[in-house]
Amino acid sequence: MAPIKVGINGFGRIGRMVFQAICDQGLIGTEIDVVAVVDMSTNAEYFAYQMKHDTVHGRPKYTVEAVKSSPSVETADVLVVNGHRIKCVKAQRNPADLPWGKLGVDYVIESTGLFTDKLKAEGHIKGGAKKVVISAPASGGAKTIVMGVNQHEYSPASHHVVSNASCTTNCLAPIVHVLTKENFGIETGLMTTIHSYTATQKTVDGVSLKDWRGGRAAAVNIIPSTTGAAKAVGMVIPSTKGKLTGMSFRVPTPDVSVVDLTFRATRDTSIQEIDKAIKKAAQTYMKGILGFTDEELVSADFINDNRSSVYDSKATLQNNLPGEKRFFKVVSWYDNEWAYSHRVVDLVRYMAAKDAASSKM
């Protein structure tokens, strides 16, 4: 199969992480051709600086430099990564105005956070792209895919705008998938994600009229917040629809988060049985997506872990009421930047393979 022609709209935190995940998997210029990256600036020197120096993830494994597309331009507008040229394109208010067709881009990774509605994201298709992957929860009827859970539902003929869900849904859904697949069942559940701060938060107390607590300084506070991650699991695992809800606590760490799911099973079981089932899944049908640890680990130990969800058997609890055999707390870690970005790449590859197979039929 020819390299997948990809464009990244929005070269901020997640856009860059997705690009770095492509490089980390050894796909750049081989299986994936990143034709262009789009942002408000086209300053390739600044992009190269950001990619070379990452506070959390460190130095890249690839070479990166910036060059001019022609002597007439003021600043370098082309990234050269491992010898492969990537054009830096100026952002547009309307995705339909981006030159995807002219550039030969087939798959757009929409990572601005602005075009998460299906109708708005379809602007990329009007601009010449064939498919769009939104690196966030989407609205307006876009198909939501969580790799390892429901990717088989992707239809080349009908799914042109696809959401990769959220990083938290990508952590929670694999755990819930195993619990339901292995017949533990979920009668009801409450999820809390202890989530590292993100770029949308404030470094010092600032204005946030829609979310007063969200306007407080991120690096010195534990901030309660909302999340739709638990409810979104019902979109990819229909048997849990309406059974899960949750909230978030934003905490003063720059990366890595952890999901705490307290649930009631539909049958009697034990911690040992749950541990065994999840460990087996992590080694077999969920390998590479779900991990298992029985070590005494902390959040920093999961930086750059590309698995969506790493179950912590040391933190699993069972209600200690006499005779209670259905009430449990399970805990799973995730690098909310790195693992999620790898799943975006996996989803693009999966879609491209299915699309190619469909076109031959």
UniProtKB/Swiss-Prot annotation:
Keywords: Glycolysis, Glycosome, NAD, Oxidoreductase, Peroxisome. The record marks 195 as: Activates thiol group during catalysis. Pathway: Carbohydrate degradation; glycolysis; pyruvate from D-glyceraldehyde 3-phosphate: step 1/5. The keyword NAD applies. It comes from the Eukaryota. The keyword Oxidoreductase applies. The active site is at 167 (nucleophile). One of its GO terms (biological process) is glucose metabolic process. It is found in: Glycosome. It is an enzyme of class 1 (oxidoreductase). It catalyses: D-glyceraldehyde 3-phosphate + phosphate + NAD(+) = (2R)-3-phospho-glyceroyl phosphate + NADH + H(+). One of its GO terms (molecular function) is NAD binding. Coiled coil: none annotated. Its EC number is 1.2.1.12. Homotetramer. Belongs to the glyceraldehyde-3-phosphate dehydrogenase family. This is Glyceraldehyde-3-phosphate dehydrogenase, glycosomal. The lineage of its organism: Eukaryota, Discoba, Euglenozoa, Kinetoplastea, Metakinetoplastina. The gene is GAPG.
